[in-house]
Amino acid sequence: MSTPTGQPAYVLHSRAYRENSALVDFLTPQGRLRAVLRSAKGKAGSLARPFVPLEVEFRGRGELKNVGRMESAGVATWMTGEALFSGMYLNELLIRLLPAEDPHPAVFEHYAATLLALALGRPLEPLLRSFEWRLLDDLGYGFAMDADINGEPLAVDGMYRLQVDAGLERVYLLQPGLFQGAELLAMSDADWSVPGALSAAKRLMRQALAVHLGGRPLVSRELFRKP
């Protein structure tokens, strides 16, 4: 029998589970894993918090694992204010969208890089839009940002609407919720200096995410609205 080996992980969420235990959702290169952490009030429990790089040994073959060993694998990412809210938003997105035990190593790497950028005080909106887009793309929900659903290049002066899971459709009559071609092309190039590109990207990602999140709102979004 092979001995379980540790793998890099971050805690996405933790809650009390039975006596002195916690039920923890982890993000790993092998996907989102849920595991029971025994003696959660001890040393291991102090590590089981978000934004701490960990090495975790998981035991068990079922969907609910057990934490065999958990150690710090680096310095915790320290965030406050809107950067902290942003990190909580990323965690909630991953819990809601990432299937259990579905490997997405690129998502793990981008998550770790985004946490570091948030801690360094980088502008929040470009980081969040990039994470949302790359998460959708990695899960198979992405679409072209430089061409419409017919494969035609986007026109700078064109107007488009999102057909979720299909792509961008050009329209010729004004209606609510449209996107300008210039804004979309700027998003494709991550050129946030173009006027309106960031606000349009936020609208576009909300539309793209909504169908996959279902009707239940994201709790972390409410944090940004509080005074």
Curated annotation (Swiss-Prot):
One family name in Pfam for this protein: RecO_C
BP term (GO), one? DNA recombination
* Superkingdom of the organism of origin: Bacteria
Keywords carried by this UniProt record = DNA damage, DNA recombination, DNA repair
SUPFAM superfamilies attached to this UniProt entry:
ArfGap/RecO-like zinc finger (SSF57863), Nucleic acid-binding proteins (SSF50249)
The entry sums up its family as follows:
Belongs to the RecO family.
**Per its database record, what is this protein's job?**
Involved in DNA repair and RecF pathway recombination.
UniProt cross-references to HAMAP family, sorted A to Z: RecO
Which named protein is this?
A: DNA repair protein RecO
Q: Which organism is it from?
A: Pseudomonas syringae pv. tomato (strain ATCC BAA-871 / DC3000)
